[in-house]
Amino acid sequence: WIAESQMMKETEDVVHMTLDFLPLKSYANITEGNALRVDWESVVPKHELSYIMGNPPFVGYSFQSKSQKDDILSVYVDEKGKSYKSSGKIDYVSGWYFKAAQLMQGTGIRTAFVSTNSITQGEQVAGVWKPLYERFGIHIDFAHRTFRWDSEASIKAHVHCVIVGFSNEPNPAPKRIYTTERYQEVENINPYLLDAPNVFIDSRTNSICNVPQMVYGNKPTD
């Protein structure tokens, strides 16, 4: 309804007249709840789905409330139900990737999310994506690299985003990396949104070469 109303207003501005709402059929299939606590298959059976699309909340791990951190810790768990070591240092949007990857198992569902770009940068990459690749066997089908989020709301959202499409079934379509002006067909898209092998750079406490010990380095965080 919100999108329909926005588009109708823009159309009225173009044609300079008042219009009736488009004859779109409405379905009352909205479920209210915490998406990271709800069993998604209790909302809709996964074998009835073809696509999952969304724009999950943008909350960097440094700005999450206690309840949001608890949400992530409850979602990002291994096969034994234990939270992954990195679960406390990943953005809130990551929970939607994990829930989608779980639901997609044994299906041909394809998923795409608009997300904070930090999940494709730095140490978050291994924390977010390594469980998805190793446990659920997902692969990235297409990606739009970082772009500035420009909403039409009165209070603008000052965030930089990416769009990532992924699945765990073979996809014959060409893999594409998009930027604002163009796209590139590639052999593989890794979690850093590069045309390169799927390599994860984990954080480590010991140096890989003979250099002085670093006590505390530069720390850009979101």
Task: Label every PLM stretch briefly.
Residues 28:
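Short, conserved active-site loop motifs that form the nucleotide-linked donor/cofactor pocket
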Residues 31-32:
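Conserved residues in the N-terminal Rossmann fold of short-chain dehydrogenase/reductase
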Residues 1-12, 16-20, 24-25, 35-222:
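Signature of N6-adenine DNA methyltransferases within the class I
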